Amino acid sequence: MKITAIKDLVRKDVPIYYRRLFSGTLVIEMVNSTVESRIDFTVETSPMGQNEIIINSMEQVDYPLLPLNKEVKKFISLLDETGGLPG
């Protein structure tokens, strides 16, 4: 299982400046197929400057949830560090 992209990524307006809410379509490459799943997630900055990624909702995927969530959070963190998330 490998996460290849998040398509149609849109930032939603939130009045709290330290929370950024996003929605998009997660593209997951499995062994024999590619699966797309809708995802909503939040990137919240703590007072110490660390980012916490919270997955609010994700469509059901035929893969164990804990490893999938770990990989999704790692991918989102990488996107955030490289400037891949919309402003």
What spans do the regions from the language model cover?
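A short, amphipathic edge element
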Residues: M1-V10
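Acidic, low-complexity intrinsically disordered segments
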Residues: V10, T34-G87
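Compositionally biased, intrinsically disordered low-complexity regions enriched in proline and serine
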Residues: Y18-R19, S23, P64
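Short, solvent-exposed beta-strand/turn "edge" segments of beta-rich domains on protein surfaces
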Residues: R11-R19, M30-N32
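Short beta-strand segments that buttress and anchor functional surface loops
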Residues: G24-E29
